[in-house]
Amino acid sequence: MIYMTRCETAYTETPTLIDDVPYPQHAHIIPETFKNAKRGMAYPPHKLIDRVVTEDVLAYVENNPVEGKTGFIFAAGNQGWMGNNGRYDKNPEAELHYKVKLPFIVLTNIYAGRIASMFGVHDHVSTDASACASSLKVLMDVQNLINNFGFDRVIVLGAEDGVNNLILEFFGESGASLQYKDEDKRQPSAFDDINGGFFIGQGAVLA
């Protein structure tokens, strides 16, 4: 049997209605940083990580050891990690790529390694950047590691660098996220049966 023992989030439990965009919709945001993120300014990933990888969480893992293998997966699928954000030209991530000749997506693996070492995880460390909703995809990876590869515990950190206009418009136009005008239709959600649809930022969590 697979079950979750603890969960931490970096955003407010109640989603915020963003209605000054072409496709008005609710989204889970960090209120004090959303103003800059909305304009397309990257929110440093390590700042977001620090919000959920707290001393309490680290102490919980340390004080509740499990026998056997422990894995860690960093779920980060936002294209901002790759320095590919169309909202602004002077992209600090792309500049980093140019100056140090390091593809920015590689930093997800660096972050994953650093965070895993904080938890004392060495059996399996990986990055899941398969899609913008990597935190949903990673649930299947957790099940696979436990059922087929003999893992007893898997720690998952999902992080996005910020909700901005580009993402809201892309998800809204494609119908991937739930628009405000459709909320009363009670569409099924990928995460739960309460919201009635997918809200941007709903997959950012540490479990």
Spell out what each predicted region is.
Residues 1-124, 144-148, 174-199, 205-207:
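Conserved "HGTGT" condensation-loop signature of ketosynthase/thiolase-family condensing enzymes
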Residues 135:
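Short conserved active-site loop signatures built around small residues
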Residues 139:
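Short-chain dehydrogenase/reductase
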Residues 150-154:
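Short, high-confidence coil segments that cap the C-terminus of an alpha-helix
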Residues 159-161:
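Acidic/serine-rich, low-complexity amphipathic helices located in mid- to C-terminal regulatory regions
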